[in-house]
Amino acid sequence: PFEIVVSRNNLVIDLGTLTDEYEKEISIHTTATSKDGEKTILAGKEVTIVDTVKLDGLTKGTKYQLKGWQMLKEENAELLIDGKRVENDYTFVADDEEMKVEISYTFNASALGGKNLVTFEELYDLSNPDEPVKVAEHKDIEDDGQTVLITERIIKIHTTATDKDGNKELEAGKDVTIID
């Protein structure tokens, strides 16, 4: 700390003591992938997106809660499945200024083929459990690191049509049976 004195015409103005302490800013860097680390996931009844979140600037010993949810990139809207937001949270006590945590989101993505999903996060300080304070967020709909593509499930069917004896050539007639 240091003192600054401002004076003019023998009048001194006391500005108090100045310090150059600053409040640390918490940064969030994330990568959303499949369980296998892929950026594409095949549409299905039960898919899981794993969000790996690197946090920097935490206060050791402080209790935090990381909340996350899925967004539809093209619509810039929350992903709702059966009317409910696809979300999850993780509560932890910081054991270091830098930490890496994972949050998983498992949901029915059967109808989401061709959609890009983006994970959004908010970090809350729970020092006062009655009044959580948001200390950081990462909500960028254009962030490729937070984006996963749900791909269409393509089912290929191969068939062979024959008559009842297995022949591929039939004679036109009134009572013809084709077996596929």
Regions found by a protein language model. Give the residues of each.
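Solvent-exposed loop/turn and edge beta-strand elements of beta-rich ligand-binding domains
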Residues: P1-D180
